[in-house]
């Protein structure tokens, strides 16, 4: 029977990862995700796993690379500036087709920024986590329950597609407490015949590597990898719709900002405005199919974010000039209020000819 408990978001992430079969965690303390690492330091040894506080974020991601190469389910976590330091290692994992899970509990930036919640790493997560030609699935929870659900799913995605996967949370979700139904522990994990555990006469000699010195070989592998990305784009788009069936104004928001946007949508409906919420759960692949469905009745889209305007680029690409696209955001760790978003909805409605 599933267990329901009251937990912080960071702790729910950690416990769910353990139940997903994660037995190697390598981290480094940074606000606002330190509780995740602290929880792992207590729980991991009790279940026969390995917790190691690395000497740096760079070391931590390369330890994930090593554990993943040996076929283990491994994870690291950090917050915005720490994720930047992990970028090279994430690229190496992508180039070696290694599964692993990276948690980013975002804070304000750029630079050292602040310790308040932010969503300013959207571009980094979906476009430029590291150098080279690669993508990785990015999941965006909006509740403590989804913090648990997303990391549980992330390990399966990582193994299925042999890719790093990121859970993009934020300091608000990491620090808040809500009831969460924890998933059942996985009883079996997929076999990984490619892992460096000895071939035992069952396969050819194998080296896990991202270095290819001939251009043709590297191009061939990149093309094969992008064919896999197309499968992910087709099969793994996830989103949630709220009051969207007849919406003429579609608010698009993810993570913590979607909670605020939801309240604003309810308030706008009470004033007679036909507005709904589209909440991307996968940021990559972006839920273009849901945008396409909404275009059958939407006259305008409003992207609400805790940054200066990043996801709005993907909204514009998906809409492709067929409706107006507006943006409202707060930055630096400031959380928008429902009243602010309601005002932005009314402005979009006027520009879209709805009011």
Task: Annotate each predicted stretch with a short phrase.
Residues 1-128, 135, 143, 331, ...:
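Thiamine diphosphate
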Residues 8-12, 226-249, 262:
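Glycine-/acidic-rich phosphate or pyrophosphate-binding loops and their flanking alpha/beta elements
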Residues 107-109, 169-176, 255-257, 308, ...:
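Glycine-rich beta-alpha junction loops
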Residues 116-170:
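Conserved thiamine diphosphate
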Residues 162-241:
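Conformationally flexible catalytic loops at phosphate/diphosphate-handling active centers
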Residues 239-278, 284-290:
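Redox- and metal-dependent alpha/beta enzyme cores, enriched for Fe-S-associated oxidoreductases
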Residues 305-355:
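Peripheral docking tails and interdomain loops at the edges
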């Amino acid at each position: 029977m599933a267990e329901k408990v009251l937990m912080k978001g960071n702790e729910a992430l950690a416990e769910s990862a353990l139940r997903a079969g994660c037995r190697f965690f390598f981290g480094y303390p940074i606000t606002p995700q330190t509780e995740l690492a602290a929880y792992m330091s207590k729980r991991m040894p009790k279940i026969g796993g390995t917790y190691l506080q690395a000497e740096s974020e760079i070391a931590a991601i390369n330890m994930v690379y090593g554990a993943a190469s040996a076929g283990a389910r491994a994870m690291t976590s950090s917050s915005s500036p720490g994720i930047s330091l992990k970028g090279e290692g994430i690229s190496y994992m992508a180039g070696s087709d290694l599964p692993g899970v990276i948690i980013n509990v975002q804070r304000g930036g750029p630079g050292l920024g602040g310790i308040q919640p932010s969503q300013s790493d959207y571009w980094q997560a979906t476009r430029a986590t590291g150098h080279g030609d690669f993508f990785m699935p990015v999941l965006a929870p909006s509740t403590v329950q989804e913090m648990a659900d997303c990391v549980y799913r992330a390990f399966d995605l990582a193994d299925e597609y042999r890719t790093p996967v990121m859970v993009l949370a934020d300091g608000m979700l990491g620090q808040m407490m809500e009831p969460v139904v924890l998933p059942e522990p996985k009883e079996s994990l997929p076999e990984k015949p490619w892992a460096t555990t000895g071939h035992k006469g069952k396969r050819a000699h194998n080296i896990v590597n991202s270095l290819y010195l001939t251009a043709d070989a590297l191009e061939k592998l990149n093309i094969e990898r992008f064919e896999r990305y197309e499968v992910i784009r087709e099969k793994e788009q996830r989103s949630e719709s709220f009051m969207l069936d007849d919406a003429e104004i579609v608010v698009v928001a993810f993570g913590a900002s979607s909670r605020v946007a939801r309240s604003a949508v309810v308030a706008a409906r009470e004033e007679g405005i036909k507005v709904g919420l589209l909440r991307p759960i996968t940021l990559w692949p972006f839920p273009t199919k849901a945008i396409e469905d909404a275009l059958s009745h939407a006259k305008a889209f409003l992207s609400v974010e805790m940054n200066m305007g990043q996801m709005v680029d993907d909204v514009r690409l998906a809409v492709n000039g067929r409706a107006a696209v507006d943006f409202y955001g707060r930055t630096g760790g400031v959380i928008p209020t429902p009243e602010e978003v309601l005002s932005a909805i009314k402005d979009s409605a006027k520009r879209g000819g709805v009011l």
